[in-house]
Amino acid sequence: MAETLKRPGGELASRPLHFFWIVDCSGSMFGEKIGAVNHAIQSTIPEMADAAENNPNAQLLIRTLKFSTGASWVTSSPVKIEDFAWDDLDAGGVTDLGQAFELLSAQLMIPPMTDRALPPVLVLLSD
């Protein structure tokens, strides 16, 4: 799945870097807290895209996992940062972090994650 870049002196393989947003959407995050999370993530996207553009050795792939009463993928498949768009999340329910970790762990196995991938980045946002 590695994309090959043409460079002077030969080709360089771009390795996938999986970045996971793991967002607490339980009732305790209602109001200002989930608003701050939505704003923070939205604000980071351009910076992440710039960093990815300046690093030809990695292909930044984004996924979002939310949890409250249960857990589910907001972004079901990895999306290139340049194609990623954030949709604001709402809060309500109880905190089911265990279910989120189960869904996440299934995606961190090889496969579906490739052994050529860089170590993943996991960002947990919760109160």
Language-model segments: what does each one mean?
Residues 1-20, 25-35, 109-116:
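Acidic, polar low-complexity linker/tail segments
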Residues 3-13, 61-72, 96, 100:
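Short N-terminal helix-initiation segments at or just after the protein's N-terminus
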Residues 17, 27-59:
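…and closely analogous acidic/polar surface helices at protein-protein or active-site interfaces
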Residues 22-26, 37, 64, 104, ...:
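DG-centered beta-turn motif at the end of beta-strands
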Residues 49-50, 54-57, 77, 113, ...:
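A generic "cationic amphipathic patch" detector
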Residues 57-88:
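Short beta-strand-loop
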Residues 69-78, 117-123, 127:
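A broadly tuned preference for mixed-charge, low-complexity surface segments
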Residues 72, 83-119:
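Von Willebrand factor
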